[in-house]
């Protein structure tokens, strides 16, 4: 039986994370995030997820189908058949070398920039990896174009993760100041169940990390380091590609454009803070809004916006306003399909 990874899978995984964050924030605000509070949060998240799933299933028509972005989980095997094996091998060797260089040049010193401790040949490895990735994408596609294009997104996500991981790997203790404050707060909540006073902001990230910590046994320290870089690497390339394909037909150019976006500053995605996580959701909301075509997708945008509001109002309020404007726009143009 073939398994598929598609946009529905990405939507649903994002929905689950948002529901855990939002339900956990509400439970923590009015109760606590002890074991009972975590259990209540998970039950609420599961119930809401089932309701959303039923809503999607009931209203899923050819026009509202989300699974158009579909490719096999075994697509790397197919990618080997449609791409140059030497290019792929070279890319993974260079990618591994980049991570190795980062791990062997960690420092506990207070430095202004990670480039102070990284050797010059890291830039050579990174540049060669980027060039080979561009060659893989630009290479003439084989017989199964869809599988190759979608497999390339996985490679781009790996490249994004490498790019977003430089700081949290090099700074062995941690990067920035806010991250330490938030981690200390979450450690206290994990031990005591709550910390007073309870604000109306930050709770979305606190609840998400603490609940993930309790159900996966991954330390809060590691979750606090990896959350935003990992989520950004997974969801940003897919969301951007999905939006671009709705506007431009040349899929190869769209993929190359996603890689090119790395030339812009991406400091929001190199460490986990409530503001950075909320900004990530806001960016995802904007790209999802560009392709919103049915009520289900609009509801998902509202869910992401409310979650962003529970994490950091600076990004949450614009997210809510964008969702409202999107509703007015589609309502006026009668573009939203039930």
Residue map of PLM features:
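Membrane-embedded, hydrophobic transmembrane alpha-helices
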Residues: 1-69, 75-145
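Short juxtamembrane and helix-loop transition motifs at transmembrane-helix boundaries
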Residues: 2-7, 112-113, 185-193, 216-219, ...
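Membrane-embedded helix bundles of polyisoprenyl
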Residues: 16-25, 156-163, 205, 209-214, ...
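Membrane-interface helix caps and helix-loop-helix hairpins in membrane proteins
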Residues: 29-32, 168-174, 222, 265-275
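Extracytoplasmic catalytic/substrate-binding loops of multi-pass membrane glycan-assembly enzymes
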Residues: 171-185, 195-211, 217-220
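Hydrophobic alpha-helical membrane-interfacial segments at the cytosolic entry of transmembrane helices
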Residues: 334-338
């Amino acid at each position: 039986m073939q398994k598929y990874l598609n946009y529905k899978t990405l939507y649903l995984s994002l929905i689950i994370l948002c529901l855990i964050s939002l339900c956990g924030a509400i439970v923590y605000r009015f109760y606590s995030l002890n074991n009972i509070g975590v259990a209540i949060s998970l039950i609420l998240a599961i119930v809401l997820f089932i309701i959303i799933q039923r809503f999607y299933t009931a209203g899923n028509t050819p026009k509202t189908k989300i699974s158009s972005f579909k490719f096999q989980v075994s697509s790397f095997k197919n990618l080997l058949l449609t791409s140059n094996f030497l290019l792929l091998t070279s890319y993974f060797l260079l990618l591994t070398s980049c991570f190795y260089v980062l791990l062997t040049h960690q420092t506990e010193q207070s430095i202004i920039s990670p480039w102070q401790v990284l050797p010059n040949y890291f830039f050579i490895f990174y540049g060669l990896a980027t060039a080979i990735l561009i060659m893989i994408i630009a290479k003439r596609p084989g017989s199964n174009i869809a599988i190759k294009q979608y497999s390339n997104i996985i490679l781009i996500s790996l490249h994004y993760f490498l790019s977003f991981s430089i700081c949290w790997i090099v700074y062995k203790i941690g990067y920035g100041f806010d991250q330490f404050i938030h981690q200390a707060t979450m450690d206290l909540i994990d031990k005591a169940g709550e910390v007073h006073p309870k604000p109306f902001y930050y709770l979305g990230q606190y609840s998400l990390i603490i609940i993930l910590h309790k159900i996966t046994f991954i330390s809060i320290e590691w979750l606090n380091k990896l959350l935003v870089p990992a989520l950004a690497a997974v969801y940003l390339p897919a969301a951007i590609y999905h939006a671009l394909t709705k506007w431009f037909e040349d899929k190869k150019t769209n993929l190359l454009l996603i890689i090119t976006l790395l030339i812009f500053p991406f400091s929001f995605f190199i460490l986990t803070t409530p503001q950075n996580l909320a900004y990530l959701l806001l960016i995802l909301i904007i790209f999802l809004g560009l392709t919103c075509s049915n009520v289900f997708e609009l509801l998902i945008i509202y869910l992401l916006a409310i979650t962003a509001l529970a994490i950091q109002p600076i990004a949450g309020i614009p997210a809510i306003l964008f969702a409202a404007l999107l509703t007015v726009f589609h309502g006026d143009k009668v573009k939203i399909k039930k």
